[in-house]
Amino acid sequence: MARYTGPLTKKSRRLGTDLVGNDKSFERRPYPPGVHGRGRTKDSEYSLQLREKQKARYAYGVLEKQFRRYYEEADRAQGKTGDVLLQILESRLDNVVYRAGLAATRRQARQMVSHGHFLVNGKKVNIPSYRVSTHDIIDVREKSKDLPPIVIARETFETRDVPAWLEVRPNKGRILVHQLPTRDQIVIDVNEQAIVELYSK
């Protein structure tokens, strides 16, 4: 199954949530694409659960097979399955780069990681799905510090809302992972319990 690479704004409108982050096009038209003015039929429980899964999948850019593996891992772990699932997704390196404000979107962050622009604890990591751990140190590689997204991140850092579980030192191009995120630190418009119910059937 190929990764979806089309316009995310259309997916955002269909699923009713901003999958990109500060998507101006979605803000202007937050209703489903197509003909407007028709009343919506009541969604079934299954379709509501499926929508929540799709929202999470598209937001984090994860394929179905990988998403299911994340769910199965979360289901085996201690704690609430839905909370653990979101923690796993948030802990991906591409998401951490995005949350730290070093990329404008997760897609851009994924591309930057894939191109080898980051070190984790001093070693180059080019796998977007790499999972960070508490006390990890993520650095922009020296030769990558003049990349436009990194320069923009330094210049606009004061306007970024970085989650408390991360610390960013923009002038050094460094991200410190103080802890893994708790549910209340994960800002995503998704009902994770609906995802759990979908996979539990």
UniProtKB/Swiss-Prot annotation:
<dbReference type="GO" id="GO:0003735">
    <property type="term" value="F:structural constituent of ribosome"/>
</dbReference>
<feature type="domain" description="S4 RNA-binding">
    <location>
        <begin position="91"/>
        <end position="157"/>
    </location>
</feature>
<protein>
    <recommendedName>
        <fullName>Small ribosomal subunit protein uS4</fullName>
    </recommendedName>
</protein>
<comment type="function">
    <text>With S5 and S12 plays an important role in translational accuracy.</text>
</comment>
<dbReference type="InterPro" id="IPR002942">
    <property type="entry name" value="S4_RNA-bd"/>
</dbReference>
<dbReference type="InterPro" id="IPR018079">
    <property type="entry name" value="Ribosomal_uS4_CS"/>
</dbReference>
<keyword id="KW-0694">RNA-binding</keyword>
<comment type="subunit">
    <text>Part of the 30S ribosomal subunit. Contacts protein S5. The interaction surface between S4 and S5 is involved in control of translational fidelity.</text>
</comment>
<dbReference type="GO" id="GO:0006412">
    <property type="term" value="P:translation"/>
</dbReference>
<dbReference type="GO" id="GO:0019843">
    <property type="term" value="F:rRNA binding"/>
</dbReference>
<dbReference type="InterPro" id="IPR001912">
    <property type="entry name" value="Ribosomal_uS4_N"/>
</dbReference>
<feature type="region of interest" description="Disordered">
    <location>
        <begin position="1"/>
        <end position="45"/>
    </location>
</feature>
<dbReference type="InterPro" id="IPR022801">
    <property type="entry name" value="Ribosomal_uS4"/>
</dbReference>
<dbReference type="InterPro" id="IPR005709">
    <property type="entry name" value="Ribosomal_uS4_bac-type"/>
</dbReference>
<dbReference type="InterPro" id="IPR036986">
    <property type="entry name" value="S4_RNA-bd_sf"/>
</dbReference>
<keyword id="KW-0699">rRNA-binding</keyword>
<comment type="function">
    <text>One of the primary rRNA binding proteins, it binds directly to 16S rRNA where it nucleates assembly of the body of the 30S subunit.</text>
</comment>
<keyword id="KW-0687">Ribonucleoprotein</keyword>
<dbReference type="Pfam" id="PF01479">
    <property type="entry name" value="S4"/>
</dbReference>
<dbReference type="GO" id="GO:0042274">
    <property type="term" value="P:ribosomal small subunit biogenesis"/>
</dbReference>
<dbReference type="GO" id="GO:0015935">
    <property type="term" value="C:small ribosomal subunit"/>
</dbReference>
<keyword id="KW-0689">Ribosomal protein</keyword>
<dbReference type="Pfam" id="PF00163">
    <property type="entry name" value="Ribosomal_S4"/>
</dbReference>
<comment type="similarity">
    <text>Belongs to the universal ribosomal protein uS4 family.</text>
</comment>
